[in-house]
Amino acid sequence: MSEYHTPVMLDESISALVSNPSGTYADVTFGGGGHTAELLSRLNEDGHVIAFDRDSDAISNRIDDPRLTMVRADFRFIHNFVLNEAHETQDITLREKLTGGLDGILADLGVSSHQFDTAERGFSFRYDAPLDMRMNREGGKTAADVVNEYSGEDLERILRIYGEVDNARKVAQLITSARDKSPIGTTGELDEAIKAALPKFAEHKYLAKVYQALRIEVNHEMRSLEKFLEGAADTLRPGGRLVVITYHSLEDRMVKNFIRTGSADGKEEKDIFGNIHAPLKAVNRKPILPQESEIASNTRARSAKLRIAEKNDGGQER
């Protein structure tokens, strides 16, 4: 599993998650199964884990353990799945646990090492490969569809918002100019199309932002994250924990806002007395960052931030 993806902040995340070794938990970003394996190791025979992933490559890493239920689905469906499973499962004990809510939910956001390192997935500018970027390759638009079919205005918008790309308008113009001559079908063709916009001494950092923007658009990542957070809050039992590892400012801001206010955009909803009713409360006011030793052994951990929240009993008033 480590060859597929090295789990980030493994001990910190699982230690924060597990309060009851007999409890029921969800790992909604299964990937290589590293977090799930560690979670299972800390549960007793009565514990149970539900693991989600929409990528068929990840599902093939399933762990042979009767305490594990694998679900091939986007994590935004967690609440619907738990509600349905609570009514339909033949396992009476699991049904009772699900009816009471989950004890904890873990989400390790972003792209797995396997997805980055598999050239034909098209997630990385390090390889000249088809411009795909779909986490679920069985349907939906590809990154090639986005760069060839979106208007210049829409390209500029997603580059600016999802990638926080400097000079997004110029990049969008370069893309539309290149595709007018010939469709852009590979990562190499995209890199060539926008090379005039790349800063001389920070090409890779700039390209990473462009690719991030396209990937987020292709996979509806921000929309899925918002729906997941809402579903997670509804699915946790009072006192249950939500543990989220983020990798860029957009998703971290959304997670932070939701924990603080119960709204992805950070807008506070108050009652007539001026109290804010939020479903979660922060356990750590500041995010936990990876140790230097972990960053040295796994460079993809360097931008990670770990946030921990706990489900309130009846909503929080401030």
Which stretches of residues belong to each language-model region?
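S-adenosyl-L-methionine-dependent methyltransferase catalytic core, i.e., the SAM/SAH-binding region
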Residues: 1-318
